[in-house]
Amino acid sequence: MNKKKFLFFLMGPTAIGKSSLALEIKKKFPLIELISVDSKLVYKGLNIGTDKPNKSDLKNFSYKLVNIVKPKNIYTVINFYNDVLKEIKNILKSGKIPLLVGGTMLYFKILLNGFANLPPSNSIIRKYIFKNICLKKKKNLFNLLKKIDPISSKKIHINDVQRVLRAVEVFFVSGGFPLSELIKFFHNKLPYKVFQFGLIPDNKEHLYKKIEKRFFFMLKSGFKKEVQNLYNQKFLDPKLPSMNSIGYKQMLLYLKNKYTYFQMIKETIKSTHKLVKHQLTWLKKWPNIIFIKDNKKDLLITKIYKILNRNL
């Protein structure tokens, strides 16, 4: 394997300082390129509530997979998988080293191991496709399959309505990926050496206090106005993944007079604490990972320096 075919993972719970540390690493090692592994940073306009790096840092450090979709769109794990593989290949091809940083643990897992199964069947979507889109006609259903997935349409007979419907359903459930493409992702393990680091709290109570302090800072920085502006875009459904994010969901309920201001703050902090516990549970079970405590971040920079020296 080519010596340069390796990359870094930097994982950790929310608010622990992953992004700022990643930017510091990028400053010290220009050879490194940053890729975000965060299911919310992909959305444009979700800035304050996601603690997104500022415009200057995003531009100067070429942070990948940030601000790539509109909040009215649904960005799935399959979208991420497809996008991140392209970014990794492009970075390695340019002779640089990818550093993937974030807290969306499912994304990291899928990237490492590929997909184990197709998206689960959804009876509501199946009925809607057949009744409303195809008007209960198998010819219309098959023509739709030919349009969205011509490869699968050549392998499935028009009279096999269940298989045709399943192939069409997969396209819609996956966020626009043909069945013939998804199959390629099955158990498709990442073909590069990965050095994995987990940034963990030295003191969880300190992290929880940091979360509270950060959210109050977000409120002072105009978070309410940010959510109000998003909500004023009438095409934005509160149930969309973008608007269902922690903080945005609670602020929307406050703006709709379903929460008091105090309830909004309390529920946001409570949900963030729950997310942190979930992320730390993932990390505890994560194989082949080097843990770095958040009060010893310089140790990570030293380790990366040694790895770069050994492998370049």
Swiss-Prot record:
Nucleus in keyword set: no
Enzyme class: transferase
Region (Interaction with substrate tRNA): 38-41, 162-166
InterPro entries: Dimethylallyltransferase, IPT, P-loop_NTPase
Site residues, Interaction with substrate tRNA: 104, 126
Binding positions (substrate): 14-19
Annotated residues for binding of ATP: 12-19
UniProt GO MF annotations: ATP binding; tRNA dimethylallyltransferase activity
Recorded catalytic activity of this chain's protein: adenosine(37) in tRNA + dimethylallyl diphosphate = N(6)-dimethylallyladenosine(37) in tRNA + diphosphate
EC number: 2.5.1.75
Subunit structure, as described in the record: Monomer.
PANTHER family, sorted: TRNA DIMETHYLALLYLTRANSFERASE (PTHR11088:SF60)
Biological role: Catalyzes the transfer of a dimethylallyl group onto the adenine at position 37 in tRNAs that read codons beginning with uridine, leading to the formation of N6-(dimethylallyl)adenosine (i(6)A).
Record-given protein name: tRNA dimethylallyltransferase
Organism of derivation: Buchnera aphidicola subsp. Cinara cedri (strain Cc)
